[in-house]
A protein has these predicted regions:
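Accessory helical-bundle/CTD segments and flexible terminal tails appended to RecA-like ATPase motors
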Residues: 1-149
Length: 149
């Protein structure tokens, strides 16, 4: 109930901040914090993973991922336990992958419709355009760009 009231992205941010504070990584994280301002629907869908406790545990584990392969391992685990992933869960896993790939390279990534702006650590800005303003096209364009960077 609480998560639906505050929204998944805010909840995730609060959870991530708490986990960082608990693990004393706060100083390191603040230096290279990535600000993702993407207008996409992405969350671990309660229709796929109905048990709150399991979903929260997956959010926690995903927030701790530092390498892309860790996200892929958890993705495989979710598929094994709950079946084929829905679009929102796939997009959430893409967001986690984007955070990992962009960390220590970019300050922020944002979008307005299909226009995507990357702001590097040196404040240099770069604009790219996704095929469309669909969430999956935006995420695909960002991932493709980050893998080239």
């Amino acid at each position: 109930g609480h998560i639906e009231q505050i929204g998944y992205s805010l909840y995730l941010k609060m959870l991530e901040d708490e986990l960082n504070a608990l693990s004393k990584n706060e100083v390191d994280q603040k230096e290279n914090k990535l600000d993702l301002k993407l207008n996409v629907n992405a969350f671990l869908n309660s229709e796929l993973i109905s048990e709150d406790r399991l979903r929260l545990e997956l959010y926690r584990r995903l927030s701790k991922c530092e390498q892309v392969y860790e996200v892929y391992e958890i993705e495989g685990e979710i598929e094994d336990r709950f079946g084929k992933l829905d679009i929102y869960t796939k997009q959430f896993l893409s967001l986690i992958t984007i955070k990992i790939l962009a960390l220590n390279k970019f300050k922020s990534i944002s979008n307005y419709e299909q226009n995507i702006q990357f702001t590097a650590l040196n404040d240099e800005k770069e604009l790219i355009k996704a095929k469309s303003k669909d969430d999956d096209d935006i995420l695909e364009a960002i991932l493709t760009h980050l893998r080239k960077a």
